Amino acid sequence: MERSMYAGRVRSEHIGTTITLKGWVSRRRNLGGLIFIDLRDREGLMQLVVNPENADAAVVETAESLRSEFVIEVTGTVEAREQANDNLPTGAVELKVKDLKVLNTAKTTPFEIKDGVEASDDTRMRYRYLDLRRPEMLENFKLRAKVTHTIRNYLDDLEFIDVETPMLTKSTPEGARDYLVPSRVSQGHFYALPQSPQITKQLLMNAGFDRYYQIVKCFRDEDLRGDRQPEFTQVDLETSFLNEQEIQDITEGLIAKVMKETKGVEVTLPFPRMSYDDAMNNYGSDKPDTRFDMLLQDLTELVKDVDFKVFAEAPAVKAIVVKGNADKYSRKSIDKLTDFAKQFGAKGLAWVKMTDGVLAGPVAKFLTSIEEKLTDTLQIEENDLVLFVADTLEIANNTLGALRNQIAKELDMIDNTKFNFLWVVDWPMFEWSEEEGRYMSAHHPFTLPTEDSAAELEGDLSKVRAVAYDIVLNGYELGGGSLRINQKDLQERMLKALGFSEESAYEQFGFLLEAMDYGFPPHGGLALGLDRFVMLLAGKDNIREVIAFPKNNKASDPMTQAPSLVADKQLEELALHVELENE
């Protein structure tokens, strides 16, 4: 029979009607001579009741045979429950079963299909189709669908054109490693899966599309963590003839619309702006979490004359104050913080506590000459813990920024009901790579430098600033964008500054440079990480929870066993030979 409605949508107004439902058995129990069955579908649970005294014998026999996750079809009459269950949307009603059919049976599942499941991540991913049956997972994907629907409507209303860009592209240097796809037709040659549609969307601006968007899959072969996956989805925008403020206004409107439609939250516009330098100096991060205080304090000048070599000779000495929680940190727990700090390049972690009105701790004896001034500068009060890092400014900022976030989580200092958006602006164009031994793009090689710093492309690259902007939410980079270079000579200078010879620049980006000979308009754009945005809206801490079939931390899929070896014949067609490390 045709399904009448979803089980999770049956309500009191349906009492007295005969309906047909289809779904999975969540559980079955015998109670007081009656058989109760919880039927689950996409929209929720509905209680079914079989009374052996007045039900058909075949129905009773079928009901007795049911096990969890059997797929069933049931027809019956909606009745009011004797005792309502206020914890269920369908809790005021139940279905008196007249007909019951098993559509498919099920083996015992490797974990119970319910929220709060106790199973390893790999087990959940190995049986992802079962994991996705759980109500909280279904809700995540309903939220994701609503977010993308809202985004499309908003951008369509602003006359953006949805354009699909190629998945098989050219491998280019800079950024993360590419995923490569060998060509059978042009043997020895490779496509790359796009890390972003950056160049193609710029070319669409040269084509006169004016406003482009795409909700697009991107690929990066990089080390994984909770907010990264090898394949991910971004909301990609590009516009012509708009400045950075206008692009930011469009983005803020989009985010405000999503927040209103999906969470019922009114966000205040415009979002706060913070320079990159202020973010690093005050928060120790280019994606600051502003839901709590504990800002970094610069003590370099204050401690330069103390009788403590580590402080006196360090290029920078900075500190954070953990207010009112010193008693929660024993020497052992501070040693753990020290080990954590060393992961970010710090040689160690100095500390003092305010106990009975005086500073105490391993370095307190070196600070007696400045104790009063230090206490005043940092506003140290009873039971405060002060953590110091003495090192280069970069290491001090990065280490204390990471400690700030770690301690806030440990002490439950973060208000998880807040959505704190902000823009980080005034970015450096380049960042130094110790691994590469050279400057690399902080964003990408097509970012427009500020007019007053462009001359340094042939000078001190550390002084070149970018017309770039990142949008941050609760300590996560939600997205980033910039104005782009549209002048050929400036693009050539940028590539030269990055170490490209003229020959290599044209070999890699000749098609883009050639396009700049044909009236390339001023343009700029932005990309938002859709997976990360939905993760934060759903209150999750791993984007695997909002991606239907994600990879694990080894970039593998435990369900399909991808990546896998392929047949020798396939390799021969591609003129490839694979040598494994253990051969």
Swiss-Prot record:
Cellular component, GO, one term: cytoplasm
Binding site for ATP: R220, D221, E222, Q229, E477, G529, L530, D531, R532
Keywords: Aminoacyl-tRNA synthetase, ATP-binding, Cytoplasm, Ligase, Nucleotide-binding, Protein biosynthesis
Coarse class of the protein's main subcellular location: cytoplasm
Species per Swiss-Prot/TrEMBL record: Streptococcus thermophilus (strain ATCC BAA-250 / LMG 18311)
Subunit: Homodimer.
HAMAP family assigned: Asp_tRNA_synth_type1
Name of the protein in its database record: Aspartate--tRNA ligase
Biological process according to GO: aspartyl-tRNA aminoacylation
Region spans: Aspartate: 198-201
GO molecular function, one term: transferase activity
Listed EC numbers: 6.1.1.12
Group of enzyme by EC: ligase
Catalytic function, reaction form: tRNA(Asp) + L-aspartate + ATP = L-aspartyl-tRNA(Asp) + AMP + diphosphate
Function: Catalyzes the attachment of L-aspartate to tRNA(Asp) in a two-step reaction: L-aspartate is first activated by ATP to form Asp-AMP and then transferred to the acceptor end of tRNA(Asp).
One Pfam assignment: tRNA-synt_2
Disulfide bonds: none
Similarity section: Belongs to the class-II aminoacyl-tRNA synthetase family. Type 1 subfamily.
InterPro entries given in the database record: Aa-tRNA-synt_II, aa-tRNA-synth_II, aa-tRNA-synth_II/BPL/LPL, Asp-tRNA-ligase_1, Asp-tRNA-ligase_1_N, Asp/Asn-tRNA-synth_IIb, AspRS_core, GAD-like_sf
NCBIfam families hit by this protein: aspS_bact, PRK00476.1
